[in-house]
UniProtKB/Swiss-Prot annotation:
Keywords: Amino-acid biosynthesis, Cytoplasm, Histidine biosynthesis, Lyase. It catalyses: D-erythro-1-(imidazol-4-yl)glycerol 3-phosphate = 3-(imidazol-4-yl)-2-oxopropyl phosphate + H2O. Transmembrane segments: none annotated. One of its GO terms (cellular component) is cytoplasm. The keyword Amino-acid biosynthesis applies. Its EC number is 4.2.1.19. The lineage of its organism: Bacteria, Pseudomonadati, Acidobacteriota, Terriglobia, Bryobacterales. Belongs to the imidazoleglycerol-phosphate dehydratase family. Its main location: cytoplasm. HAMAP family: HisB. This is Imidazoleglycerol-phosphate dehydratase. NCBIfam families: PRK00951.2-1, PRK00951.2-4. GO terms for biological process: L-histidine biosynthetic process.
Amino acid sequence: MRSATIQRDTKETRIGGTLKLEGRGRYEIATGIRFLDHMLELFAKHGGFDLKFQADGDLDVDQHHTVEDAGIVLGQLFAKALGDRKGINRAGYFVLPMDETLAVVAVDLGGRPALVYKDRVKVRLVGDLQTELVHDFFDGFVVHAGANLHAKVLYGRSNHHKLEAIFKCFARAMKYACSKDARLKDQLPSTKGLL
């Protein structure tokens, strides 16, 4: 069973997490930012990942450290759980309609961090989450997971739906990319011979 546990403590945040890739979508999330909790909960559920995630950050200063560091720790969890990445599909994508909103996410776990993120969110807050920080969350994730991630809302009206559609797409794309391809067995999905 591919799994990982990470504890990351800085002067700004203390974040611990446990991830099981072949899970059942179970979660225990507490970041101190309820809308971020909601996004991580639906990420676990739609990805079929078991995720425990506890964050204690300097929210009295700002949400930035907590949100960015949450992305860092999630990326570290995936990097550790994936190990040498032999036999994985490596890349995945998903397109999701959520009521009036349509979003797409594509991911490549090939070890080359890059992020293109376009959410079309036009407000400062969705729930209690500072929306500009979602980009920082994904930036932290891609660097520490060794992932190339493209996320885009094609259209939509509700800012809540836009973010939720992105996280659901992210979950489904990661689910496929992390999945094992029985034909590859212990081979790396790369002509270079390394990721």
